[in-house]
């Protein structure tokens, strides 16, 4: 991870180098904290005697907080302009509330601890992303490279923690507390903005900004902002793909620990599987902006949902080799969705709405989709067993993907009859290649001219 930090910071000027390293370690700190908490939670709940339905309810507390509480933190962050201070306070509160899990192992005690913890922890990701993405733009650091630090940190923690928790499972929440304090330190070390910038321009890193301009947000001229945050109604389909994909990914992630224990394996295997999935993200991060430019955001999102079906089927087989193969698909089931959606949201959000834009994405992905995954997954798991539940979830994801693809094509057809042709990436589901690149160049030229006139 240190070598990656140096690579991120290799820019002219000491301030830029220091800023790149600070952004890198802030991302590492968050994903290390998430890696110590999320993957092992269902295993811990199983070890203290919770049923699948009870686990589903407990795991739903975090999505509920994402839906109802996290947007309030994002709005406070944007309204005050003090994103770093808000994120620091949330990190400190997360560290303190993690220790509430030691109050008892009854269902009520665990439920209370979970509710209090997620009130703060659920807001860390969108606020951290907003700060890091804006910092990457301000200091000309590639966001994909910074995000690789988070992947490495997550993989390192889940592997080490998985082995450690085999011997001392009760230590999980002490580790979460310590890593939340590390997150606090990394936030305090984040650089300030070097100058006032347009919030939309500050949303992307230099490389991501060049390629994500192919993401459509100008297909509907003179249309009121969607949710008062986004420039185009196309955001509905971006969020729909994120929902469908996360519905499968959320089920798999939430109940993988229980499934592994049910199959007779230990927490060590949970750590190994989580590390494998995290490390598989690295190749995608190296080429993510090129993939978006080549195939388009919608193509990648549709492809990711199809691969999510394959991942669920492989894990559902219950064999270690197939489970490892399924986890290797993390790169094309999570990271492609995360990168496409995060960059799209960052570019299409109106000025001053960056935190709220990322908040909407997290609300749909980590909130609504996770609630469906956890509640339905817990009920199906108790009724049919975890193996069959994986297969049933794969079928639901496949149907959802088909519905969103058809709806998007219908919407595009309507737009094409009333507006100028959409930019290249919006054609992702029906074509790519030279024609797409030509359309992208034309739309990019038009967009640059419009922005120049606006200035």
Predicted segments with their positions:
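Helix-to-loop junctions at the C-terminal end of transmembrane segments
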Residues: 68-82, 164-166, 283-296, 381-382
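Symmetry-related core transmembrane helices of the 12-TM Major Facilitator Superfamily/SLC fold
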Residues: 172-189, 389-407
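Conserved MFS/SLC helix-loop-helix module at the cytosolic interface between two early adjacent transmembrane helices
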Residues: 68-105
């Amino acid at each position: 991870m240190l070598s990656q930090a140096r690579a991120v910071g290799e820019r002219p000027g000491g301030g830029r180098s220091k800023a790149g390293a600070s952004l890198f370690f802030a991302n590492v700190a968050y994903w290390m904290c998430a890696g110590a908490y999320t993957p092992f939670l269902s295993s811990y709940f199983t070890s203290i005697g919770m049923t699948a339905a009870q686990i589903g309810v407990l795991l739903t507390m975090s999505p509920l907080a994402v839906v109802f509480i996290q947007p309030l933190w994002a709005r406070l962050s944007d309204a005050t302009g003090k994103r770093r201070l808000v994120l620091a306070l949330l990190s400190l509160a997360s560290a303190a509330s993690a220790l509430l899990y030691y109050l008892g192992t009854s269902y009520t005690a665990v439920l209370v601890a979970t509710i209090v913890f997620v009130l703060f922890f659920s807001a860390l990701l969108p606020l951290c992303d907003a700060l890091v993405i804006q910092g990457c733009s301000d200091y000309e650091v590639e966001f994909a490279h910074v995000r690789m630090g988070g992947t490495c940190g997550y993989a390192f923690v889940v592997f080490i923690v998985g082995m450690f928790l085999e011997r001392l499972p009760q230590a999980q929440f002490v580790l979460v507390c310590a890593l939340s304090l590390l997150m606090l330190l990394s936030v305090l070390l984040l650089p300030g903005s070097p100058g006032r910038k347009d919030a939309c321009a500050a949303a992307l890193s230099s490389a991501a900004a060049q390629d994500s301009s192919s993401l459509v947000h100008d297909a509907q001229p003179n249309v009121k902002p969607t949710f008062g945050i986004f420039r185009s109604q196309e955001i509905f389909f971006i969020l729909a793909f994120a929902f469908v994909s996360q519905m499968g990914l959320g089920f798999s992630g939430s109940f993988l620990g229980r499934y592994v224990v049910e199959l007779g394996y230990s927490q060590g295997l949970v750590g190994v599987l989580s590390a494998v999935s995290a490390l598989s993200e690295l190749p995608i991060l190296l080429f993510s902006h090129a993939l978006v430019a080549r195939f388009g955001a919608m193509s990648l999102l549709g492809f990711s949902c199809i691969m999510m079906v394959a991942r669920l089927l492989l894990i559902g087989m219950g064999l270690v080799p197939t489970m490892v193969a399924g986890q290797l698909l993390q790169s094309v089931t999570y990271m492609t969705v995360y990168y496409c959606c995060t960059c799209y949201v960052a570019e299409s959000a109106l000025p001053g709405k960056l935190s709220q834009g990322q908040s909407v994405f997290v609300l749909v992905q980590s909130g609504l989709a996770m609630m469906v995954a956890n509640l339905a997954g817990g009920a199906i798991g108790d009724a049919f067993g975890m193996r069959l539940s994986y297969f049933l979830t794969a079928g639901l994801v496949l149907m959802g993907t088909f519905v969103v693809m058809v709806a998007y094509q219908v919407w595009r057809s309507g737009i094409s009859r009333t507006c100028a042709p959409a930019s290249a990436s919006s054609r992702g589901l029906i074509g790519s290649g030279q024609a797409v690149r030509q359309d992208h160049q034309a739309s990019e030229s038009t967009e640059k001219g419009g922005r120049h006139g606006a200035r």
